[in-house]
Every structure is written in C-alpha cells, then in structure tokens.
C-alpha cells in the first residue's frame, strides 16, 4: 500500500496517454484522501515529471497537480510549497516552453494566489510566484466570469444518494473550465481516434456472457477519455471557423458516440448486433412507378416461363436459336470396289446388290473426270475380308471416260512395219528385171539406192496410214507386224533363189 500513490502518479503522467486520464487522477485523489501519508511520494513523482523535456508529460503533471489541489485539501498545498514546485514552474515559464504548458502554468498560479488570499493569505508563496512573473512582464490569461471557484463552499444540504448523469457531467465540466476547448488540434483529434479504435477492439473482444470485463482498469480509462474528448469536440465545433478542422471534429464525434453507445449497451446487458455495411439500393428519382412495373414484368416472365416449360414437356428439346440441321438427301458412302485410274477400268466384287445404282458421271467442257457419287448407300452385307478375297468382275456396262486419242485431233503416224514390208516384195516383183550376170553389179546398186530412198522418205512411197483403231490393242498390232515381216522375208528369199541360179556361170 506504500507505493500505490506513486504508481498511480506514474500512470497519470505516462507519455503513452493522449490526454489527461481523469479516472487515474481521481483514483490518485482517493488514495491520498484514504492515506494522507502517501501524498508525499505522489507529489515527489509529479515534480520529477514536471521537469521532463516532453511537453506532453509536463501538461499531464500539471493536470494531476490541479486535481490534487482541488480534492485533497491543505496537505497537498503545503507539499507543493515544501517541494519547491512553485519556483520550478516559474523557471519553466521563463524558458519559453510549449504554449500549452505555459498557458496552463499561468492559469494555475493566478487561480492559486487568488484562492489563498494574495500576499496576506495563508500561503503567500503562491502570490510571490505570481508576482515574480508579473513583474517580469509576463501577461496572464484573462479570467472568465463563468469560472468555478477553486474552493468548494461548505455543504448545507444532505447528499443525494443517487447522483444523476447530468450532475456527473457538470462536475467534470467544472474541472475542465481551465482548459481551452478550442485548442483541440488536428494531432489531438488523431490521438482521440486512436483511443476510439482501441476501445472498439477491446469491447469487441469481451465475452457478452461476462460483463465484468467492462470494469477493467484500461477499459474504464478509455471510456473516460472518450467522454472527455466528446465534450471538447462539441465545444470545438461551436467555436472554430476552420472547415477542415470542423469536418474532422464531426467525424470524431460520430465515432465517439458509437463506441460509447456500444459500451453502455454492454453495461446494461443488451445484445449488441454485429454492425455490417448494408448495401444501399439504387432508386430512380425520375420514375415513381418503376417498382410496380418491374414487379408486373417479373410476374409476366414467370408465367410465360411456366407455360413454355409445360409445353416443352411433350416435345423434344431443341435449341431455339439454331435451327435443326436439314436431312441429308444424298449421303456419301465409301465404295468397297477398286478402280484403275490408268486404264479407267472399275472392278467390283461378284456379288451385286439390287439397291445399288450406277454412278452418275458428268462431263464438263474440258472432259475432266469426277468421282462417282451414289444416291443410295451401299449395304455392307459382307465383311471387309470377304470383299478383299472375292474375284473381281469387269464391269462392261458402266460408261468410261473417253480415251485421250478420242478427245484430241488425229495425228499422222509413220507407216507401220507391215506396210513397209508389204511394199518390198512388190518392188522386187515389178522393178527387178531378169538381167544377166554381167549386169548384176549395176542392178544391185540401183536396188540399194531405191531401197534407201524408200526407207528415208516413207510418206512419198507409201500411202498415209490410218491410226490404229480403238479395238486393236498394242499387242495385236505388234503381232500383226511380226507376221507380215515373216511373210515378206519368206517371199523375198524364195524369189532370190531363181535369180542366183540364173547368175551362176555355165
């Protein structure tokens, strides 16, 4: 218990606080009132914190001293004088400290010297500090008529057992009269927003079935800070002319009201619903009857969809966007037969079908050949192996494409071998005279020259030969030439034998 006041003074001047924590300050006053012996340690800690270089710690120490002087009586006044706190305050003002710290010290000295009766009062040390600064040319802030007296008048009526919320607000407001509400800066607004966020997280983490968690020291301190900031924000909004500062203050006020309402609901045991952002529906301003029309359209679409679904149960499902494909009138099937493209012959199996139609051929102007297309499918009654090993039958009924020599102009061919050989015996029979042995050499030269002319110019000595007929095959023509050549050779050999016998000498 010996260090409770000192520890409480340390917490009241903690640099992590964004402002004076009135709950801790009141707790410090209660400890000193219950045990006045602890006031010495508390004042010692406050003096040390007042000499800090951090202006925030200095202002927190001044608020704690003000609270003790208003609530703890003459013991604290004497300790402030004995610990030489008043000379320290005068030195701080002369060093030109932070404006908020300076204004707070001047306000406290003026209030204290007036409350203690000036130079002839009970504690002239307060007046001496005030007079020293005044003689140094330092101006003190003007006093307001609505300021609350430093000392509370003696009680004349009994204390009401149950205090109302308005009385509590009035008491807190009285303790804040020395503070300038319009001095709330942008940094303090941001610090207050941080306290709101911390309190919101802590309230959300509490178990709804155990409201005792609201009595935790940190939560109580944050709630008191939020209430204090709420009053300062309202004063700021009513007095400031800065639009940006006013907007920030209004936003902070909304957040403060929300978190305090959340705390009050939890304290009363009411279930707090989880706040979730609800989507705002888009509303057309120009049309008033859009909702009714949309409902009617929806009902019409629903009825029409039901009718279509009932009608579609007896019919096949089809895609209304794409029309059904047309039925194929001429299916193309692969023929199992084979075709010789060199000769144009078509080979088919021996088995014939009744429903097979001959392929239709079309002859274009350039006589191009097109593959046949069957009008009806060819039934495959046999297996592929049977179709491969069956004996092909030459189809003579089908019309074949014209031969190349029929589509082209007739050419002039040289005389065949048979024509040449046929001319030779005639020549020997008609042109070779019966000469004697003396004229054999000259006749042989003439015969050789004429045969040479005959072989070099066949068209002059032989009649033009017609091209082979279509029905004659090359093998037949070659065979005929060989036969003619053999006959010619036989006849020439038989005619030369008598001539040789006649040429023999007697």
From Swiss-Prot:
Which cysteines does the record link by disulfide bonds? none
Q: What is this protein called?
A: TOM1-like protein 3
Gene of this entry: TOL3
- GO MF assignments: phosphatidylinositol binding; ubiquitin binding
PROSITE patterns registered for this protein in UniProt: GAT, VHS
Task: Tell me the tissue specificity.
Answer: Preferentially expressed in cauline leaves.
The VHS domain covers 12-141
Q: Please name the SUPFAM superfamilies in this protein's record.
A: ENTH/VHS domain, GAT-like domain
Q: Please name the source species.
A: Arabidopsis thaliana (Mouse-ear cress)
GO annotations of cellular component type: cytoplasm; membrane
Q: Where in the cell is it found?
A: Membrane
């Amino acid at each position: 218990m010996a260090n409770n006041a000192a520890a409480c003074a340390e917490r009241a001047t903690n640099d992590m606080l964004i402002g004076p924590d009135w709950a801790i300050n009141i707790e410090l006053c209660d400890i000193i009132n219950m045990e006045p012996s602890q006031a010495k340690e508390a004042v010692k800690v406050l003096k040390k914190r007042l000499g800090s270089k951090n202006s925030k710690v200095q202002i927190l120490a001044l608020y704690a001293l003000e609270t003790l002087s208003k609530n703890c009586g003459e013991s604290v006044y004497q300790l402030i004088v004995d610990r030489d706190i008043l000379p320290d305050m005068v030195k701080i003002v002369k060093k030109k400290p932070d404006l908020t710290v300076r204004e707070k010290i001047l306000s406290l000295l003026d209030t204290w010297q007036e409350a203690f009766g000036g130079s002839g009062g009970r504690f002239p040390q307060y007046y001496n500090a005030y007079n020293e600064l005044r003689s140094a040319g330092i101006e003190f802030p003007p006093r307001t008529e609505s300021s609350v007296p430093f000392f509370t008048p003696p009680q004349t009526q009994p204390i009401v057992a149950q205090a109302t919320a308005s009385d509590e607000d009035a008491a807190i407001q009285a303790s804040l009269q020395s503070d300038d509400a319009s001095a709330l800066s942008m940094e303090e607004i941001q610090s207050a927003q941080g306290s709101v966020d911390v309190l919101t997280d802590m309230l959300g983490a509490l178990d709804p079935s155990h409201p005792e968690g609201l009595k935790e020291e940190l939560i109580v301190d944050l709630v008191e800070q939020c209430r204090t900031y709420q009053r300062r924000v309202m004063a700021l909004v009513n007095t400031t002319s800065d639009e940006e500062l006013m907007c920030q203050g209004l936003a902070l006020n909304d957040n403060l009201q929300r978190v305090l309402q959340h705390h009050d609901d939890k304290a009363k045991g009411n279930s707090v619903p989880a706040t979730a952002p609800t989507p705002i529906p888009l509303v057309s301003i120009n049309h008033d009857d859009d909702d009714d029309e949309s409902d009617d359209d929806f009902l019409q679409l629903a009825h029409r969809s039901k009718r279509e679904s009932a009608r579609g149960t007896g019919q096949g499902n089809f895609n209304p966007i794409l029309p059904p494909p047309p039925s194929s009138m001429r299916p193309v099937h692969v023929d199992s037969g084979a075709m010789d493209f060199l000769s144009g012959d078509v080979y088919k199996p021996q088995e014939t079908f009744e429903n097979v139609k001959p392929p239709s051929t079309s002859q274009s102007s350039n006589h191009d050949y097109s593959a046949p297309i069957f009008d009806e499918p060819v039934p495959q009654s046999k297996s592929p192996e049977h179709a491969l090993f069956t004996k092909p039958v030459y189809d003579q009924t089908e019309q074949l494409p014209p031969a190349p020599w029929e589509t082209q102009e007739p050419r002039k061919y040289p005389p065949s071998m048979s024509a040449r050989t046929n001319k030779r015996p005639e020549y020997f029979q008609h042109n070779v005279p019966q000469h004697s042995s003396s004229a054999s050499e000259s006749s042989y030269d003439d015969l050789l020259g004429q045969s040479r002319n005959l072989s070099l110019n066949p068209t002059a000595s032989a009649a033009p030969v017609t091209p082979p007929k279509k029905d004659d095959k090359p093998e037949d023509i070659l065979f005929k030439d060989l036969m003619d050549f053999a006959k010619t050779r036989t006849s020439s050999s038989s005619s030369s034998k008598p001539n040789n016998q006649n040429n023999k000498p007697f």
